[in-house]
């Protein structure tokens, strides 16, 4: 059994999926994860499909140096956004896996929400490129470890109406005096 970095409140009401050493850029994956965290599963699938078709963009908030601006970032309140299709494909596959795990557990598909997404940087894979004058330069890739936990949305418990109102000493004295005056004038 693999250890996840977060533990859900109810293990029976959640499903998990994870991928290790995935050949997709860590920085792009982090931005996709931050965007889909908290979405419902259906909404996340629609969003990821739209990113693949360049209808919606993933906002780049942390790793945004040199990232171009696009009007599609306005819905998230940013100007810098991109369409990291390869990272989106990995997230789509992991969400499909989590959905299948939830279905196997008998969870309600319409109530599933992405409760936890985490992306960690995997060890860099090394290659080399040959340069002029006999030099060699490192050619590194930045793979990712991704873990996702989806859970059924908890139903909101209605707040009790039986609230005891706290009255200060001064407010209580005023109320008693007012009641006494009403009693005197009524008599």
UniProtKB/Swiss-Prot annotation:
- Which is one Pfam family of this protein? Ribosomal_L22
What PROSITE patterns does the entry give?
A: RIBOSOMAL_L22 (PS00464)
Compartment annotation: Cytoplasm
Q: Which UniProt keywords apply?
A: Cytoplasm, Ribonucleoprotein, Ribosomal protein
Q: Which residues form a coiled coil?
A: none
Query: Which GO terms of the molecular function aspect are on file?
Result: structural constituent of ribosome
Does the keyword section mention Ribonucleoprotein?
yes
Q: Does the keyword Magnesium apply?
A: no
Biological processes annotated in GO: cytoplasmic translation
User: Which Gene Ontology CC terms are recorded?
Assistant: cytosol; cytosolic large ribosomal subunit; preribosome
Q: What else does UniProt say about it?
A: There are 2 genes for uL22 in S.pombe.
Report the family membership. Answer: Belongs to the universal ribosomal protein uL22 family.
Q: What does this protein do?
A: Component of the ribosome, a large ribonucleoprotein complex responsible for the synthesis of proteins in the cell. The small ribosomal subunit (SSU) binds messenger RNAs (mRNAs) and translates the encoded message by selecting cognate aminoacyl-transfer RNA (tRNA) molecules. The large subunit (LSU) contains the ribosomal catalytic site termed the peptidyl transferase center (PTC), which catalyzes the formation of peptide bonds, thereby polymerizing the amino acids delivered by tRNAs into a polypeptide chain.
- What does the annotation say about its assembly with partners? Component of the large ribosomal subunit (LSU). Mature yeast ribosomes consist of a small (40S) and a large (60S) subunit. The 40S small subunit contains 1 molecule of ribosomal RNA (18S rRNA) and at least 33 different proteins. The large 60S subunit contains 3 rRNA molecules (25S, 5.8S and 5S rRNA) and at least 46 different proteins. uL22 is associated with the polypeptide exit tunnel.
Q: Mind telling me what this protein is named?
A: Large ribosomal subunit protein uL22A
User: Taxonomic classification, please?
Assistant: Eukaryota, Fungi, Dikarya, Ascomycota, Taphrinomycotina
Originating gene:
rpl1701
């Amino acid at each position: 059994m693999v250890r996840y970095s977060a533990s859900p409140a109810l293990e029976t009401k959640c499903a998990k999926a994870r991928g290790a050493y995935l050949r997709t850029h860590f920085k792009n994956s982090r931005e996709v994860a931050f965007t889909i965290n908290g979405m419902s599963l259906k909404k996340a699938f629609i969003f990821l499909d739209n990113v693949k078709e360049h209808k919606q963009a993933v906002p780049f908030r942390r790793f945004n140096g040199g990232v171009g601006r696009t009007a599609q970032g306005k819905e998230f309140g940013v100007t810098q956004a991109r369409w990291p299709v390869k990272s989106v494909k990995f997230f789509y596959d992991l969400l499909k896996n989590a959905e299948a795990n939830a279905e196997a557990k008998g969870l309600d598909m319409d109530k599933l929400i992405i409760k936890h997404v985490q992306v960690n940087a995997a060890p860099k894979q090394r290659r080399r490129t040959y340069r002029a004058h006999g030099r060699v330069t490192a050619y590194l890739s930045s793979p990712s470890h991704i873990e996702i936990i989806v859970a059924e949305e908890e139903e909101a418990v209605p707040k009790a109406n039986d609230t005891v109102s706290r009255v200060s000493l001064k407010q209580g004295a005023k109320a008693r005096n007012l009641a006494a005056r009403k009693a005197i004038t009524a008599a």
